[in-house]
Amino acid sequence: MKVNDIYSNAFNFGSYINTGVDPRTGQYSANINIITLRPNNVGNVEQVLNLSFSPLTTLNNGFGIGWRFSLTTLDVKTLTFSRANGEQFKCKPLPPNNNEISFKDKKLKDLRVYKLDSNTFYVYNKNGIIETLKRIGSSDIAKTVALEFPDGEVFDLIYNSRFALSEIKYRVTGKTYLKLNYSGNNCTSVEYPDDNHNHPHSGWFALAL
């Protein structure tokens, strides 16, 4: 078995999701906050996007081996649902279109996942945020392409030809809040053209892999 295929509910506890060493598994994990998306008109609702590290993966998703962008995904081949916060759950066989997806081992009712068609899925979270997942190109993985907040404000997530996240835009104005630049498969810098209402100037940092 490849380390990328290791799955256990033990990794869904908060001690593993937060930065540090999980005393139960002995595994180290780390999260680096990249951006926090907030709507203009709703308080106390936000979506934090992190770079997350797991020693159990040998994949390089553009940020170095073991690092991934913390976005919700659904692998329709392995039936693995991965939440933005790091939790993973196995789905039962996908239902017909326009039906809710069921999970083998998930008991909490803090979200519901619906299959619109073979390429599009909706994740309804308890905090009111709706995530739209789509399969991009020939990929088996449906990725987050939109985040809709309770007041209807939407952030669109745009991917490049290599299926890597390249921009996050605010749908109403078209403003870019996050831009990721790549050299080949590797992300080389991250830009904040608008900085999510906090600063009018651009900011950026470079990644050394």
Would you name each region that the model predicts?
Residues M1-L209:
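Surface-exposed recognition patches
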